[in-house]
Amino acid sequence: MASKAMPRAPPAAPNLQSLKLCSQNDSSLETTSPSKRSALVPGRSAESSKPNPEVVQKEQKSTQHQNESIDLTGSNDPAEVKAEGNLVPKRLADEEKGVVEDGIANGSLKSSSALGKEHGIASASGSARLVGRSETGERGFSSSRCRPSTSSDVSDESACSSISSVTKPHKANDSRWEAIQMIRTRDGILGLSHFKLLKKLGCGDIGSVYLSELSGTKSYFAMKVMDKASLASRKKLLRAQTEKEILQCLDHPFLPTLYTHFETDKFSCLVMEFCPGGDLHTLRQRQRGKYFPEQAVKFYVAEILLAMEYLHMLGIIYRDLKPENVLVREDGHIMLSDFDLSLRCAVSPTLIRSSNPDAEALRKNNQAYCVQPACVEPSCMIQPSCATPTTCFGPRFFSKSKKDRKPKPEVVNQVSPWPELIAEPSDARSMSFVGTHEYLAPEIIKGEGHGSAVDWWTFGIFLYELLFGKTPFKGSGNRATLFNVIGQPLRFPEYPVVSFSARDLIRGLLVKEPQQRLGCKRGATEIKQHPFFEGVNWALIRCASPPEVPRPVEIERPPKQPVSTSEPAAAPSDAAQKSSDSYLEFDFF
């Protein structure tokens, strides 16, 4: 029975003026003394730490299993701690029963049950809710194939940073790491007191993002601040924990870097890379016609495809691709953000070999595609004309003459020596109802369970929106949009005109049956071989010139008010109060 529900506004941004800088550990993350721990171990007494030989083998066998099946969320609520094996926490089980909250229930043409039967939309008891364009849904539990988090991923520190945030290969030369290491060397720990919050950048479902400066340096970061009490009351602590765990394991040029994270009594903070170029949604709105040229689209989606490929190799299903979540760095390249809706699953990478006629033809001609940066023109990295055979090798000084050479036997259907890495978590299944209306895959709306194929559906919607300035199934309302996704065929507008390969790629990605969808079997490897990406040098894509480089950002600082020692300061007028409202919550720092 559906109920009419008003769309819920995003949570209020935390009042940073009320932040308390604490230097003690959070009471919710308690440790056990060695003497108490010894009393809890089978075969040991509290007086003696000598192990019982009869239970040593049992301890060794069970220790690894227990460590891999327990996830501490930092909450005092026992329901927030995952049980061992495939058991589902009570809180998550309760959320899954009402995972659809209020999206399909608002209509007058037909009853919800009739519409669900006609279009195959899954029904749910109780109230229903589906997130809007800027709102995200609740993350439910996944199948038993999903990999549980380990307790080692959770920091036991409160007001100081996690020691697990260390320099990673792709950011080895980042000046921001040097600034952070300098503060750590000087003070030992890194906490909220070391940052100055300058302005608010945006607000999401579980927190707000602020532009921050590391004190004593000119290094700027994006700090995501989450109110722990609000997360607990809205049952979103697990989502915040999932995002932190995913960010900790990422090391990719097109994915965010988690420099540090820390907690106070009230807030949980993630310190990440600041992207001054904004997001692709804002950038698209500034384009003529509100859509990108096809060459620019090819650049952006190629980098996103590599980021998605990396995530799937780690067993991470993103589930929230949209222009608002694609940020533009200062050099014009992109960065994928927001991982609170992501799903972590098991994956088995496979290395296979496949035939490649182009590579075989090059082998016969004694040539190869050059992989040296000095041999490639970066400005035309994604132009088809740049994909011409070349070689970095000089002539052989002691080669035999052609008369002395013996002809090599022709090999029919020879397999290319270039292997393909397939790492697609295709067996993952989740019943969660998460995402954005216009980007939801049909299998999510029908409630049939979904896996990694939903990322390739959203990738197709994303490609369509960048090319045409709108999504393909958008209706007059959220309810109509869902019905269009299920029952309406894919159509292309007459204008703007795009290439046949672009339309063909979108058709392959927006197949309503997930088993027939492009990328379902071989993942990003299959998509990268589509003619739309012809001429893209995947190995050197970071050397390509971006379509647009954002202008340098000038950081505006609040003016310092002079302090008079002779007369008491007068109360500010209403106009002055309104003009300085944007800085009031940062005065504390």
Curated annotation (Swiss-Prot):
Organism listed in the record: Oryza sativa subsp. japonica
Protein name: Protein kinase G11A
Enzyme Commission numbers on file: 2.7.11.1
UniProt: ATP binding residues: 201-209, 224
Stretches the record annotates as Disordered: 1-167, 551-589
Domain Protein kinase, first and last residues per copy: 195-533
Physiological role: May play a role in the regulation of metabolism and signal transduction processes.
Family of this protein: Belongs to the protein kinase superfamily. Ser/Thr protein kinase family.
Active site: 320
